[in-house]
């Protein structure tokens, strides 16, 4: 998401010196990351505020995976303000604990984030993962109900709940099978089960 706006602090004349960008202010991330983005922008952007193009700003900022969205404000005659919304961390990559998955679908190096997140196993595919997360959120489950998510190359998912119940899902009709799994887990008659296998259409297999 990009929002571009302008502010006129005073009347200006069409002189080159007035049009020159002499201040770029970036906010929203850590001080270190704000500085990195500022320096990159200073090196790459046009020196004239009137010739500044949003696609050039986007090309630079999109290199930083921590960014979820941002707004740009031109403060005439010579200042640019960029406010950044940091992406939310939603999962950890299982084979490399130094990387997190952002809500923007990008991988971010983990510097000091220690809060609990689901582990993602299998080859990471941003689009498929975000689509699957959306399906979960549209079911009666919450994404935070799971501590491990397994993705298989043939487009099938398994999920392990925080109560150590493994749900084996089919390749299709995920929302429907998630609803079935939720009903089983909510039923006291099945309180000791450890596996819910829903891979075969119209069949439910449970194991203790």
What are these regions (language model features)?
Residues 1-7:
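Hydrophobic membrane-insertion alpha-helices, especially the h-region
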Residues 34, 38, 54, 58, ...:
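Extracytoplasmic/secreted envelope proteins and their assembly/folding machinery
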Residues 172-208:
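Extracytoplasmic/luminal low-complexity segments enriched in Pro/Gly and acidic/polar residues
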Residues 19-21, 32, 65, 75-79, ...:
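Extracytoplasmic
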Residues 81-153, 159-160, 166:
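Extracytoplasmic segments of membrane-associated envelope/inner-membrane machinery
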Residues 9-112:
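Terminal hydrophobic membrane-targeting helix
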Residues 48-50, 91-94, 129-130, 168-172, ...:
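Solvent-exposed, non-transmembrane alpha-helical starts
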Residues 26, 43-47, 117-125, 165-172:
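Second-shell loop/turn segments in exported
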């Amino acid at each position: 998401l990009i929002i571009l706006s302008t502010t006129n602090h005073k009347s200006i004349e069409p002189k080159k010196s007035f049009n020159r960008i002499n201040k770029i202010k970036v906010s929203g991330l850590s001080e270190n990351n704000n500085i990195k983005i500022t320096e990159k922008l200073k090196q790459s952007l046009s020196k004239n505020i009137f010739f500044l193009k949003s696609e050039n700003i986007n090309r630079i900022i999109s290199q930083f995976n921590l960014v979820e969205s941002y707004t740009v404000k031109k403060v005439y005659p010579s200042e640019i303000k960029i406010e950044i919304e940091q992406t939310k961390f939603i999962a950890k990559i299982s084979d490399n604990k130094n990387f997190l998955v952002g809500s923007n679908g990008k991988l971010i190096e983990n510097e000091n984030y220690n809060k609990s997140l689901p582990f993602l196993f299998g080859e990471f595919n941003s689009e498929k993962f975000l689509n699957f997360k959306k399906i979960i959120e549209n079911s009666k489950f919450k994404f935070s109900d799971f501590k491990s998510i397994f993705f298989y190359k043939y487009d099938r998912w398994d999920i392990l709940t925080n109560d150590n119940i493994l749900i084996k899902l089919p390749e299709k009709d995920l929302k429907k099978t998630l609803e079935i799994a939720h009903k089983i887990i909510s039923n006291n008659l099945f309180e000791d089960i450890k596996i819910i296998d829903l891979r075969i259409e119209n069949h439910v297999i449970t194991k203790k």
